[in-house]
Amino acid sequence: MQSSDRDLSGPEASPSVMPEVLSECSPAPTKSTAFDLFNLVLSYKRLEIYLEPLKDAGDGVRYLLRWQMPLCSLLTCLGLNILFLTLNEGAWYSVGALIISVPALLGYLQEVCRAQLPESELMRRKYHSVRQEDLQRVRLSRPEAVAEVKSFLIRLEAFLARLCYTCESAYRVLHWENPVVSSQFYGALLGMVCMLYLLPLCWVLALLNSTLFLGNGEFFRVVSEYRACLQRRMSPKQEECVCEGSALQDAGGRAVVLDSTPAPTPTEDLTPGSVEEAEEAEPDEEFKDAIEEDDEGTPCPAEDELTMQDNGFLSKNEVLRSKVSKLTERLRKRYPTNNFGNCAGCAATFSVLKKRRSCSNCGNSFCSRCCSFKVPKSSMGATAPEAQRETVFVCASCNQTLSK
């Protein structure tokens, strides 16, 4: 400890020498520049203003390629193809000079004719999103600045996400992660090289232009819409022709039927009422069964009132139960499960003589022979007192099931 104290108290560690040594060893501290996020937003807006003409041009090209106005897109495609195929070398140089001179002239006229607005007018109108000078002059409030920063961050995040997705897609194509897409990409490149070598430049440009306009999905969408419109315009005429043809066929069929019917004798009366009376005069078994079924299925209200008077001791619940059982039976008869026109038992085809009869239990359609078994309604779960004596028609299988 003493030796160290002596070393520090020696001439090498004198106070006059120490500041010089420290000044030589430590560099001067530099002032760190602070990061201003709002200045970044202003720079981004200036960049948007600079690139606004290019953005408008891109929007116009996309508008034409998407066939939003089919006539303009078609005229543009045809006009560009004609220019590519007909212009010679001198004409191309003239077109290039025109493309250079027109933006220069427009920029000069815009700068000359622009009105100089005072700062107070800029502050009053909040004209900060039009020109870069306005962005430098106008002072935004804190909420407006925060909103601008948030909007910038959202756009930046979306741009970075799209850029990352594009890079990943290119990486997959270059590394053959999807062989089909990679083969298509390299095949297209080789085809373009061969096309540039074999065909003139004007033909290459015409083919490229036609591919851009006619090879996208929007073109096929427009074509399908126009095709559907033409079909709708032509369909009324076709419908009129079809209606006329069907009317002629109906008229011819009626004439044939009238010719084939025998001539009535003077003693016969062929009015609808007399025909029905003649048909109902001698009903066979099937008609008798059908008539019995209809009579039993639709009882008259007078009989219901009489039964209610006779059975005065019935409660309201029993009356409701009887009505519910009748309604379910009618629904079963009205909506049979077999609607194919054949008997579910013997497969006989229903006709005027072979009438359809629905089983009151399963609801299937049978002929009068297969559905000729009568069982009381109480066997199917009906609780009304009338169900003990009322019977309904069921099929053979349901009769066996209900009889057990």
Swiss-Prot record:
Annotated region (Sufficient for homooligomerization), positions in chain: 1-92
Q: Note the Gene3D superfamilies from the entry.
A: Zinc/RING finger domain, C3HC4 (zinc finger)
> Origin, by domain of life?
Eukaryota
Claim: Ligase is one of the keywords in the record: no
Signal peptide range: none
PTM (free text): Phosphorylated. Phosphorylation is induced by NGF through the MAPK/ERK pathway and modulates interaction with RAB11A.
List the membrane topology term(s): Multi-pass membrane protein
Q: Could you tell me which residue ranges are on the Cytoplasmic side of the membrane?
A: 1-63, 110-187, 209-404
Alphabetized, the UniProt keywords read: Cell membrane, Cell projection, Endoplasmic reticulum, Endosome, Membrane, Metal-binding, Phosphoprotein, Transmembrane, Transmembrane helix, Zinc, Zinc-finger
Residues of this chain that stay in the membrane without spanning it are found at 188-208
Q: Residues that bind Zn(2+) 2, according to the entry? A: C359, C362, C395, C398
Ranges per topology, Lumenal: 86-90
Primary location: membrane
The ranges of region (Necessary for interaction with KIF5A) come to: 271-354
* CDD domains referenced in this protein's UniProt entry, alphabetically: FYVE_protrudin
Q: Which PROSITE patterns match?
A: ZF_FYVE
Q: Name one GO molecular function term.
A: identical protein binding
Cite the residue spans of the region called Necessary for interaction with RAB11A and function in neurite outgrowth. Answer: 51-64
Q: Which residue windows are transmembrane per the record?
A: 64-85, 91-109
The cellular component terms of Gene Ontology attached to this UniProt record, alphabetical and capped at eight, are: axon; cytoplasm; dendrite; endoplasmic reticulum; endoplasmic reticulum membrane; endoplasmic reticulum tubular network; growth cone membrane; membrane
Q: How does it assemble?
A: Can form homooligomers (monomers, dimers and tetramers). Interacts with FKBP8; may negatively regulate ZFYVE27 phosphorylation. Interacts with VAPA (via MSP domain); may regulate ZFYVE27 retention in the endoplasmic reticulum and its function in cell projections formation. Interacts with VAPB (via MSP domain). Interacts with RAB11A (GDP-bound form); regulates RAB11A. Interacts with RAB11B (GDP-bound form), REEP1, REEP5, ATL1, ATL2, ATL3, SPAST, SURF4, KIF5A, KIF5B, KIF5C and RTN3.
Name of the protein: Protrudin
Q: Which species does this protein come from?
A: Rattus norvegicus (Rat)
